[in-house]
Amino acid sequence: MVENVTYSEDGQLLKLKWEDVYEQFKNLITFAARQQMENNGADTMMSRQDLEQEGLLKLYDCWEKWCFKENKQMDEFGPIFRKSLFRKVKQSGGTGRALGFVAIDDEDNPLENMLKDENTVDVVEKIHFSEGLEKLKETLESDIAKSLLEELINPSDQTIYNVLIDIERKKMLKSQGHRVNVPKDTTVRMKHIDQTLGISNKQYDSELKKFVKRLTIYTI
């Protein structure tokens, strides 16, 4: 692997060095591999360490393509790598289940049935590729609604961190004898997105209604 490279392929100063992306995403790689083994298992002989290695190789491939050659910044590179990572871990693990990183836990939420089923990734990809994220964002007037859309399609590092902390907190409480249900998957729920965006329940309810109306139009 290339280390201490400071210039892109076309000679520009690198916006993201290999060391930068490695430090940023090494824990996420470990987390993805561990959750795949614990919650979904593997149909192959691959171990968690093997999955971590696959994740690391995917990180390097993405860095070489998007940083060394395209000189992307973190806000552009991060969503690309996260999506690639979980796809790679799922594929390498050999299971037919997708890692559920976009879901809703509110029973009264009109998005629940659409975003919580096994075809979540397909639905989101239709939004992202067919209609275009930017086109959909242009129809939203509120910055909060736009941020909500961004988090639903590509959860930020902070949102994924919120998921990890929530799981670990519940594991700790359960180990202390408390009756706590520890999540069996790595689902990003609306409470995690709320924490990232720092919005109130009232704001959330108001913006989600606007967002659902637009989202329904673009997923028909």
Swiss-Prot record:
GO MF terms held by the record: DNA binding; sigma factor activity
UniProtKB keywords: DNA-binding, Sigma factor, Transcription, Transcription regulation
Keyword Transcription: yes
Known function: Sigma factors are initiation factors that promote the attachment of RNA polymerase to specific initiation sites and are then released. This sigma factor is responsible for the expression of the phage middle genes.
Protein name: RNA polymerase sigma GP28 factor
Organism: Bacillus phage SP01 (Bacteriophage SP01)
Gene name linked to the record: 28
